[in-house]
């Protein structure tokens, strides 16, 4: 295996950006004979891409399935081109793929590229994936802040929350159509089935304090239900805004992307009977 903490120079933003990568060159050939694809993992607010490799079992899950992981650090940008800050959306969607291909020759085929994220990164994964369905075969959001309009409304009464959004969206907290997941879902659902990405979002049943994350995810699901999506899924189980939940969510996402029964295998491992030595 190989872990790489790269620092890539962004000409677009005139600065360096940290990107963590994992390459699974030691997976069992009898199970996975080749690299199956690349999963881009987006981090949450106040976090970094490296958290995915340090706080979860993402690397082990990637090794089991022959997947390369790419985890860029995009600050508190919500993966948007900020009103008062850097152009992170353009970096993630335009410049980063070029840099990764130049330095690491990663697979570029749509069927081998997936994107997932947690919390702020869950929103980012959905937003990027729905804006670019031609690039990703699968998109997953874990405990995603998927309804920013609702959060803007809450921010009017919570100055601390409002201040999280002002650098990204401006003083009037305007949400452009290209960043509105409800509108993006309607647009993407009009594509032919074979051009739609698989969509998965998960949320813990107890994840509704302060930011009403579960309420946000349920609202997005309700928007999507009547739309002609070919392949989407909303999973929820007991849990909160925490790594334990996101780790399990990644297992379900890999299984959903690859359709290889991986989730059932891991659940079987977790349920294995524990015996106490005499």
Where in the sequence are the language-model features?
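Non-catalytic cap/lid and distal C-terminal segments of serine-dependent acyl enzymes
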Residues: 1-278
């Amino acid at each position: 295996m190989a872990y790489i903490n790269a620092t890539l120079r962004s000409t677009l933003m005139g600065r360096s950006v940290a990107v963590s990568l994992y390459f699974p060159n030691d997976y069992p050939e009898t199970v996975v004979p080749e690299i199956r694809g690349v999963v881009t993992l987006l981090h949450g607010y106040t976090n970094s891409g490296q958290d995915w490799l340090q706080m979860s079992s993402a690397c082990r899950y990637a090794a089991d399935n022959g997947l390369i992981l790419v985890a860029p650090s995009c600050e508190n940008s919500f993966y948007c081109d900020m009103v008062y800050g850097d152009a992170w959306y353009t970096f993630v969607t335009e410049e980063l793929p070029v840099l990764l291909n130049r330095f690491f020759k990663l697979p570029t085929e749509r069927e081998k590229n997936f994107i997932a994220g947690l919390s702020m990164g869950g929103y980012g994964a959905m937003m990027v994936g729905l804006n670019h369905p031609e690039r990703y075969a699968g998109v997953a959001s874990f405990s995603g802040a998927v309804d920013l309009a609702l959060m803007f409304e809450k921010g009017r009464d919570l100055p601390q929350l409002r201040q999280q959004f002002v650098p990204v969206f401006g003083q009037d907290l305007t949400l452009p159509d290209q960043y509105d997941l409800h509108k993006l879902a309607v647009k993407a659902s009009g594509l032919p089935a074979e051009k739609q990405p698989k969509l998965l979002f998960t949320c813990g049943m107890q994840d509704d304090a302060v930011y009403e994350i579960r309420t946000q995810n349920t609202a997005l699901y309700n928007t999507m239900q009547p739309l002609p999506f070919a392949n989407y899924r909303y999973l929820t189980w007991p849990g909160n805004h925490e790594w334990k939940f996101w780790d399990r969510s990644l297992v379900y996402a890999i299984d959903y992307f690859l359709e290889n029964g991986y989730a059932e295998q891991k659940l079987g491992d977790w349920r294995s009977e524990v015996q106490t030595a005499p």
